[in-house]
């Protein structure tokens, strides 16, 4: 029997009861404005780089108040469909890989805070970067290897400055992520590291000094394998490094909890 078959009173009663139990939510005015503007942008009524009408014009066009227009524009900005600068009308833009990944940020933080969440993200990073170093060993240009060498040099110069070491550590891995030339890889990698670093416990400079030295030596091993065009060794060095990093932060987190 079709869900739209009206021949059964029982079916009608069941559907009626179901609808009474789950009333449809009404859309906010801002959501309706957002949807209409999004459709207009996607249809090309407002071209990329062009400006949308002013807030006052949008208020008159949709017959809504300023808060509804501003909420709609803010939602479109989150989707990467418009850029908003103070004092200027919203300008149509094209969603980037960064926009796509940033939309996942809230969900990612929820996953990270769940039991086993950090371990799952660490595994994701391991799988992801394993492919990156293999690709780098097989395909990196001499110029890209030179950039990686420079990042490694800065990393080694930062051993005694923890904040600088973290930045140079991230930069070393960022250069790896740039080698394939895929913007989605870059956006994913940046977000993944941001999420994992934010989830790490706060520890003293002294505790991290030994860890920094170990990480730097592991970076050297990764670089050498890529320079030597050895994807298997690059993968082994990367796996050793990331597993070491994960184990170190787990140990630091446990010691901090036990000290409380």
From Swiss-Prot:
This is HTH-type transcriptional repressor NanR. Residues 55-74 bind DNA. Belongs to the NanR family. Transcriptional repressor that controls expression of the genes required for the catabolism of sialic acids. Keywords: DNA-binding, Repressor, Transcription, Transcription regulation. Residues 1-21 are annotated as: Disordered. GO terms for biological process: negative regulation of DNA-templated transcription. Transmembrane segments: none annotated. Pfam families: FCD (PF07729), GntR (PF00392). SUPFAM superfamilies: GntR ligand-binding domain-like, Winged helix' DNA-binding domain. It comes from the Bacteria. The keyword Transcription regulation applies. The keyword Magnesium does not apply. NCBIfam families: PRK03837.1 (NF003011). It comes from Klebsiella aerogenes (strain ATCC 13048 / DSM 30053 / CCUG 1429 / JCM 1235 / KCTC 2190 / NBRC 13534 / NCIMB 10102 / NCTC 10006 / CDC 819-56). GO terms for molecular function: DNA binding; DNA-binding transcription factor activity. Residues 27-95 form the HTH gntR-type domain.
